[in-house]
Amino acid sequence: MKSLDSNLDKALGRLSGGLYVVTASQGEGSTFRQSAMVASWVSQASFSPPGITVAVAKVRAIESYMQVGEGFVVNILREDNYQKMFRHFLKRFAPGADRFADVDVVNNIANGGPVLSDSLAFLDCKVSSRLETPDHWIIYGIVENGSVSDLSCKTAVHHRKVANHY
């Protein structure tokens, strides 16, 4: 892989994005499992049907949940209250650990995964297609449902300084 020169690295790092927690669930009963990750590479990709893209690193556990036909939820974090969720879902979890322990979720409103009570909004999506890049999958999802909890709040924004890490 070609290394980035300093100016290019800094220029790419200036691409900003919102802060999100992507969640997904699979299975039922004894096979039920859930996963989550912090994301900032999320973008609206189509109007009709409404669709979004999410970049997911190939090494993320949640990537295996996000296959064509499967559901996921994008929880949009609030500018005034994102730190707790951001820190919680950035930490490493032991295999099999409950990523949602000590996190308030709203049950039975999204098919794709948990909706975080503290999120500004959520988008319930179904994977329509996937595009492979060298180190990420670009997941295109059709938005099937969504809601905003507080119209007066703004989305938390992530500003990077360089492009070689999140």
Q: Could you describe each region identified by the protein language model?
A:
Residues 1-166:
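Basic, polyanion-binding surface patches
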